[in-house]
Amino acid sequence: MPQRQPPGTEEGWYILHDFRSIDWDAWRDAPDRERERALETGTDYLQAHVDLKDAEEGASAVFSILGHKADFMVLHLRPTLDHLDHAERRFESTALAEFTEQSSSYVSVTEVSGYMHEELTDGLDDLEDEGMRNYMKQRIYPELPDADHVCFYPMSKRRGPDHNWYDLPFDERREYMSNHGDVGRQYADKVSQIIAGSIGFDDYEWGITLFADDPTDIKDLLYEMRFDPSSSKFAEFGPFYIGQQFEPSELSSLFAAEPLTSETGHGGADSQTSSESSGGRPSTDPSHDEIAAEDLESRLGRFGVDLEEYPAAGYALCFESSADAEAVSDEVDGLRENFDHYDTHVMTTVRAEGGETAAISLWKNERAATTASGFLGDLPGAAEGVGAPLDGSGDAATHGTDEDDEIRGELADADIYAGQPHGEDVYALVLYSEADPDELRDELGALAEHFERYDTHIKSAVYDAEVGGDRTAVVSLWDEKDAADTAAEHLSDLPDIVARAGEDEESGFGTMGMFYTVKPDYREDFVETFDEVGGLLADMDGHLETQLMVNEDDENDMFIASQWRDKEAAMAFFRSDAFRETVEYGREVLADRPRHVFLA
């Protein structure tokens, strides 16, 4: 049998999950002096490790644990196993250890694998993609989030007679992991994770630690993942632990059975502050002063940034620099690729005006912006930055504009979705090109591979007009308008781009389009029907142009783009009997539900 090549891995910090059970009988019987001494030494131990008195890098935290399996958990991340060994034995030397027993433990090491990037086989430092390299470093040198709750569980991949993970081809395993990651990315703004490998270290193959303010977000995430094939077919789980993070100073409250009420402050990817416990990574302490929103808006306007164009933004940053604009731009390009991995990122750009250069970064919330501030403050020649919350903005769940939502409602009333659930709408970036389609497809392939790393990307492909014209289009589908607009910066560099759909000055409503996947047996019939509908459209008042575009790689994947003088003219058609008949016909011939598209 052929020997399968395992995907490359890169390791970072070692992790010890140290679970402790309290001997409550001994604690109740102990004199006050002994209990005070135990709490004093225990608090000193925990605080010293949170403050990294034993190492230059890493992180530590403590959590109360619910249920019978443990009373509290001490979590250590350190550069070496020696550090963990010392931390574990150091606890046993405290007076507090006399009242506890190590009920369980888990040893692992943070890792990223070749499922994220094939070039990882050659090592993380050899990756040419700086954005991906920085993202992976954040995974293996993580900050502990300041979230209220934690969940830990170990897991392995199944090696049974019917389902053996390690017998699958690499491409199949990578596809499983990609789809699995798609589920997790839907919770990226609610749940943080640390993934660590433990083959040869402990009884399972991985240790998973999840952090969230709302514990039901953890439950919802894991529940949804159970239906993903990578879990339902191939995952085996160990015991689960759930608990609440607390400060070392609250140890006495834990032993007194009092509520743990203080706010944690360990810092994370979305936290407001970054404590000293997050060593070993670029500083993410805020490098900006907060100013009035109107003052910041005025400053951004001076550099040509209109905040009204970014309704999703909840916090804005501006860092002026004395360095050359090109040098700053080169640095920001790398940061932007890193920032784009987070759903809370809206936009980061470099602007130059009147001999002044500024890096401007917009985020959905202040916590994420504060972390970004630490990176932006390290830009060449950067002065101390300024930031401000943007009133009425920053809803991380917002997709599209109020006008888009109004259109969605009208389309739903007209049954345009042919039964499609609300909320599956997408944004399409459509660029027309005069280049050879084969050349376009080759150029787009490299970009599409880059886009695939982002959870908001749906697909990108080259389409030819089959009915209604002779243009070639590059189509890129995204969940969010801002993401599509960002993609436009890259796609506009494709060869011989001549126009962007929706930019026709005569068109007052260029947001309407439909994507269809047609059953192969009905393809020819569908095209003929489109011809008939096209004839009806040509006679309609307010209609400018409609084309049927076909994916060059899949002739059954089609895109209908319509341009109208105004929204009212378009909606008149969608309320017409002719369109209703078309929808009924579509229920029979479509392999998938049509998706309404807003042109970005």
UniProtKB/Swiss-Prot annotation:
UniProt-listed Pfam families: ABM, Chlor_dismutase
Biased amino acid composition, Polar residues: 270-285
Region feature Disordered, mapped onto this chain: 261-289
SUPFAM superfamilies with a match to the protein in the record: Dimeric alpha+beta barrel
Keywords (A to Z) from UniProt: Heme, Iron, Metal-binding
Domain ABM: 510-598
Gene3D superfamilies per the UniProt record, alphabetical: 3.30.70.100, Apc35880, domain 1
GO molecular function, one term: oxidoreductase activity
Listed NCBIfam families: PRK09565.1, PRK12276.1
Protein name: Putative heme-binding protein NP_2262A
Organism of derivation: Natronomonas pharaonis (strain ATCC 35678 / DSM 2160 / CIP 103997 / JCM 8858 / NBRC 14720 / NCIMB 2260 / Gabara) (Halobacterium pharaonis)
